UniProtKB/Swiss-Prot annotation:
Residues the record lists as binding Fe cation 2: E60, E112, E148, H151
Keyword tags: Iron, Membrane, Metal-binding, Mitochondrion, Mitochondrion inner membrane, Monooxygenase, NAD, Nucleus, Oxidoreductase, Repeat, Transit peptide, Ubiquinone biosynthesis
Protein name as it appears in the record: NADPH-dependent 3-demethoxyubiquinone 3-hydroxylase, mitochondrial
Cofactor notes: Binds 2 iron ions per subunit.
Pfam families documented for this protein: COQ7 (PF03232)
Protein's GO biological process: adult behavior; cellular respiration; determination of adult lifespan; negative regulation of gene expression; negative regulation of protein phosphorylation; negative regulation of transcription by RNA polymerase II; oxidative phosphorylation; positive regulation of behavior
Cofactors, names only: Fe cation
The UniProt record lists the keyword Membrane: yes
Catalytic reaction equation(s): a 5-methoxy-2-methyl-3-(all-trans-polyprenyl)benzoquinone + NADH + O2 = a 3-demethylubiquinone + NAD(+) + H2O
Binding site residues for NADH: K21, K186
Broadest EC class assigned to this enzyme: oxidoreductase
Organism name: Caenorhabditis elegans
Enzyme nomenclature, EC number: 1.14.13.253
InterPro entries documented for this protein: Ferritin-like_SF, Ubq_synth_Coq7
Length: 187
């Protein structure tokens, strides 16, 4: 008797569903990051961290463009909540920046820490399925994750952990991000 051994845990249909889920949620996340930094820069453009925020925003614009290309390539529609996420993220950016540079950087730390963990979870899922099939996506997500974690470190270097009520602020922001991720994975 012969046994067929498969490395991948997914059928073709479930593999496509996995790719769609990852691209849809990551597009939403990169859209959110783009809007957060736009909101922060609207408030802090002339400040000591204005150029730092601008640099991170430029990188997020490139990340969003990458996700737009992946969505088009794999025919993945954006989450229907994109307009809501866009407004909420811009408001988060403005609101965190109104707390000063520490507030803006606390927001960066909270978001980028969670997104780094989220990218790691996705990478593990793709590796468990089939590294060869997902080679291109693994390379892209690894690069994006590394750049997001660099943003996290930038937030730490620029006193984000000194923001008023840092722990509460971080918890609120990460809870909101987790909710957005859960929604975008499905819709």
């Amino acid at each position: 008797m012969f046994r067929v051994i498969t490395r991948g845990a997914h059928t073709a249909a479930s593999r496509q569903a996995l790719i769609e889920k990852i691209i849809r949620v990551d597009h939403a996340g990169e859209l959110g990051a783009d809007r957060i930094y736009a909101g922060q820069l609207a408030v802090l453009q002339g400040s000591s961290v204005g150029s730092v925020i601008k640099k991170m925003w430029d990188e997020e614009k490139e990340h969003l463009d990458t996700m737009e290309r992946l969505a088009a390539k794999h025919n993945v529609p954006h989450t229907v909540f994109s307009p809501v996420f866009s407004v909420a993220a811009y408001a988060l950016g403005v609101g965190s920046a109104l707390l000063g540079k520490e507030g803006a950087m606390a927001c960066t730390i909270a978001v980028e820490e969670l997104i780094g963990q989220h990218y790691n979870d996705q990478l593990k899922e793709l590796l468990a399925d089939d590294p060869e099939t997902h080679k291109e996506l693994l390379k892209i997500l690894t690069r994006l994750r590394d750049e997001e974690l660099h943003h996290h470190d930038t937030g730490v270097e620029h006193d984000g952990m000194k923001a008023p009520a840092y722990s509460a602020l971080k918890w609120i922001i990460q809870t909101g991000c987790k909710g957005a991720i859960a929604i975008a994975e499905k819709i």
